[in-house]
């Protein structure tokens, strides 16, 4: 019985499993735009990608709310413009992108948003 349970767990996909880990998207996007990945700041926070103009937070689209505050914090500490790359793995995730864009526009937040899939 124990072996059957282990076999079933190994063969079934994990709930909420991502197509690729966040780091996959960070490496691909950041290298394309000549950025530096995993930059540790003086307060020990870690920016996913820093480019010449931006301090960028990467998150899966359903974690949109976290990305806004993190990006603003990184911008404050680095003196760069805040950036967010939302990872969209399902077309339905675009609703989260719209939420972020609406909030940024409504409050005139200095944040740029990109989408990757």
Task: Give residue spans per PLM region.
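Short, surface-exposed coil-to-beta transition loops
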Residues: 66-70
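Acidic-basic catalytic patches of nuclease active cores, encompassing PD-(D/E)XK
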Residues: 14-52
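Active-site phosphate/pyrophosphate- and oxyanion-stabilizing loops and adjacent acidic/basic residues
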Residues: 27, 72, 101
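Conserved catalytic cores of phosphodiester-cleaving nucleases, focusing on short active-site segments
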Residues: 49-60, 74
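Sec-dependent N-terminal signal peptides
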Residues: 3-13
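A general lysine-centric signal
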Residues: 2-3, 80
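Short glycine/proline-enriched coil/turn segments at helix->beta-strand junctions
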Residues: 33-36, 51-54, 77-81, 109
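Nucleic-acid nuclease catalytic cores
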Residues: 59-65, 76-117
């Amino acid at each position: 019985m124990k072996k059957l349970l282990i076999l079933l767990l190994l063969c079934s996909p994990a709930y909420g499993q991502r197509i690729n880990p966040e780091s996959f998207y960070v490496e691909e996007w950041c290298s394309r735009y000549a950025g530096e990945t995993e930059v540790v700041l003086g307060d020990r926070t870690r920016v996913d990608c820093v480019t010449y103009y931006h301090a960028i937070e990467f998150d899966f689209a359903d974690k949109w709310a976290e990305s806004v505050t993190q990006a603003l914090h990184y911008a404050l500490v680095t003196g760069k413009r805040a950036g967010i790359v939302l990872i969209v793995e399902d077309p339905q995730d675009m609703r989260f992108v719209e939420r972020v864009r609406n909030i940024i526009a409504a409050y005139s937040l200095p944040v740029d948003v990109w989408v990757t899939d």
